[in-house]
Design a protein with these regions (language model features):
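N-terminal Rossmann-like or analogous alpha/beta NTP/dinucleotide-binding catalytic cores
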Residues: 38, 46-59, 66-122, 126-133
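Glycine/tryptophan-enriched, flexible segments
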Residues: 23-24, 163-234
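Active-site neighborhoods of enzyme catalytic cores
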Residues: 102-173
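Residues at the starts of beta-strands that form the adenosine-phosphate
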Residues: 27, 55-59, 145
Length: 234
């Protein structure tokens, strides 16, 4: 399946399980954990490519969990600020973006459900626990292909790997690769897949009503199991 990916996306992508082709007619789900931007986002671009190539609907899923290290009111607030930008950007681009915030009364296993209903899952590569463990678990149980994509590094992690053990060795070994990529314009993906409009395994947060409104935002945050003593910066 990866042989059909655009080269600038293929070099950033890892196939995380043995499922070789999209499964069923469910959505292509782009699961965002750290790369909360629409512009030059390889995970979203790959999702658009796969969805269009296979005539499948596309869904951009942003889940904010309480279980990451040092989860706090400050960090959650920054994540919700990013959600506002993502919601507006995806709407303008004709993409379906949905936000889930884990909190009292709202803690379903969203990705576990998507692992059985999605046609394909793409996520941004974030090689630290607990996120690596979550991706491993979803990839192992999923009925569809699961890919993770490096959305952060100039030299893609899947391309170079771990063959050096010192920063200066890495700089020397990748000098030409880095120069080539820094000078290049990020290719545009013109694919326009249909947005997914079907049922979801959770109730999405209404970003416009419940996140942009700061009173409602902090009411929602009060239901999250996070450290409330680390306050947002003003």
């Amino acid at each position: 399946m990866m042989e059909g990916f655009p080269s600038h996306l293929a070099e950033r992508t890892r196939h995380r399980n043995s499922v070789a082709a999209p499964h069923g007619s469910g959505p292509v789900v782009v699961w965002l954990k750290s790369s909360f931007r629409l512009h030059e986002n390889p995970a979203i671009d790959l999702g658009r490519h796969i969805a269009a190539e296979h005539s499948l609907p596309l869904l951009i899923y942003h889940g904010i969990d309480e279980r990451y290290p040092h989860a706090s009111l400050r960090h959650h607030t920054m994540l919700l600020d990013a959600a506002v930008d993502m919601d507006e950007g995806c709407r303008k681009a004709g993409l379906r973006y949905v936000l889930h915030v884990a909190r009292d009364g709202h803690r379903p296993s969203v990705m576990k459900a998507f692992s059985q209903s999605a046609s394909c899952i793409i996520t941004d590569l974030f090689p630290l626990p607990p996120w690596t463990n979550w991706v491993d678990s979803i990839a192992a149980s999923s009925t569809c292909p699961v890919f993770d994509v490096d959305c952060h590094c100039v030299i893609p992690m899947p391309l170079f790997g771990k063959s050096v053990d010192r920063p200066y060795k890495f700089r020397d070994a990748t000098k030409k690769m880095r120069k080539k990529r820094l000078q290049a314009t990020w290719p545009t993906i013109d694919a326009r897949p249909e947005p997914y409009t079907g049922p979801l395994p959770f109730e999405p947060v209404n970003v416009n009503e419940d996140i942009k409104n700061l009173s409602k935002r902090f009411e929602l945050l009060s239901k999250c199991s996070i450290d409330p003593s680390v306050l947002p910066e003003i």
